[in-house]
């Protein structure tokens, strides 16, 4: 049982890292898009 628990935690950490990375990437792209959008709006005015 102990080994199974360790393996499960290891798999969870393996899945957790890429998910966190993807979320950070999404946040970064969203921030860039918002900045570009606000700049375009300012230019129009």
UniProtKB/Swiss-Prot annotation:
It comes from the Eukaryota. This is Uncharacterized protein YDR320W-B. It comes from Saccharomyces cerevisiae (strain ATCC 204508 / S288c) (Baker's yeast).
């Amino acid at each position: 049982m102990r080994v199974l628990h360790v393996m499960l935690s290891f798999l969870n950490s393996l899945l957790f890292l890429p998910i966190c990375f993807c979320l950070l990437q999404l946040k970064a792209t969203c921030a860039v898009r918002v900045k570009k959008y606000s700049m375009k709006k300012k230019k129009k005015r």
